[in-house]
Regions:
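Short beta-strand/loop motif that positions the catalytic acidic residue
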Residues: 195, 201-203, 207
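Active-site glycine-rich loops that stabilize anionic/oxyanionic intermediates
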Residues: 10-13, 83, 205-206
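Conserved alpha/beta-hydrolase
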Residues: 26-48
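Gly/Ala-rich beta-loop-alpha elbow adjacent to hydrolase catalytic centers
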Residues: 80-85, 89
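Flexible "cap/lid" loop of the alpha/beta hydrolase fold
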Residues: 97-134, 174-181
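Conserved alpha/beta-hydrolase "acid-adjacent" motif
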Residues: 208-217
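Helix-rich cap/lid subdomain of alpha/beta-hydrolase
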Residues: 119-167, 171-173
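Catalytic active-site module of serine/aspartate enzymes centered on a nucleophile-bearing elbow/loop
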Residues: 228-264
């Protein structure tokens, strides 16, 4: 039986942006799916037309949503997530319900103190208005260019924005921003779990939304666990690395990591 793979997107990208990855992993012998977040419409057009469908959902809501999906699978899956999806991957890996995880440019979990200016600039899109906690928040093309497409040509960034950008709930950004002041923050991860599957963390050297300093600080959170945790940095790549012209390099590194640890 093929090992299931669950792809988890982050804020401002639709689940269908994973389709090239789904196809590649199926060709590699896995059984991949890319479910939407709770409330998420099936298409980009529907998501743009009804932003309220996702408003108000927080990290715990989304993590529990994916945990329920995993519970219905025939065996423990590999989970691969980008940005907030990378945080969700760590949540699910920490629960011990996955075979392995790949967290691509993951937003900071509770305990990570690094806060580069560029990351704060992106988060402020939602945080500047407390009312956004209960609303869906959209990016302008200019904001997408800074947060996702800064390592791309202006033309490619604009193309990706038009193809994949959607409104997303503001609540997760507030939960991540204030995690270190909240004892029961939903971004708290069981980083000490000694029996979990292997975890790969990645960063893009030019990422404005989740700069490498955040991912390096995340790796340190796992220092007390004997379980496998690895870090890979992709040079000259920004936050768009899962959807831009170089996505296959990131996907292949993910596949190689799984094969290296005999998860096929």
């Amino acid at each position: 039986m093929a090992t299931p793979v669950v792809f988890i997107h982050g804020l401002w990208l639709h689940a269908t942006s994973w389709q090239p990855w789904v196809d590649l992993f199926r060709e590699a012998g896995y059984d991949p799916i890319a479910p939407e977040w709770p409330g998420g419409p099936d298409t980009v057009a529907q998501a743009r037309a009804d932003p309220g469908a996702v408003a108000g959902f927080g990290v715990k809501d989304v993590a529990d949503h994916y945990a329920a999906i995993i519970a219905g699978l025939p065996e423990k899956p590999v989970v691969i997530g980008h940005s907030f999806g990378g945080l969700l991957v760590q949540n699910l890996v920490g629960r011990g319900i996955t075979a392995a995880g790949v967290a691509i440019d993951p937003v900071p979990i509770k305990g990570v103190l690094a806060l580069p200016v560029s990351a704060l600039r992106v988060a402020s899109i939602a945080l500047r208005n407390p009312g956004n906690r209960s609303k869906a928040v959209s990016l302008t093309a200019e904001q997408f260019r800074y947060g996702f497409g800064n390592a791309l040509s202006a033309e490619e960034s604009a193309e990706l924005y038009e193809k994949w950008a959607i409104p997303s709930p503001g609540r997760p950004l507030f939960e991540a921003a204030f995690a270190n002041f909240a004892p029961n923050s939903p971004t708290k991860i069981d980083t000490a779990n000694a029996t979990r599957g292997p975890l790969l963390l990645t960063s893009g050297s030019q990422d404005h939304t989740v700069p490498p300093a955040i991912v390096k600080a995340t790796l340190k959170q796992y220092a007390k666990s004997p379980a496998i945790t690895e870090l890979r940095t992709f040079e000259d790549r920004g936050h768009s690395l899962t959807i831009d012209h170089g996505w296959q390099e990131v996907a292949q590194v993910s596949l190689d990591f799984l094969k290296q640890h005999s998860i096929t």
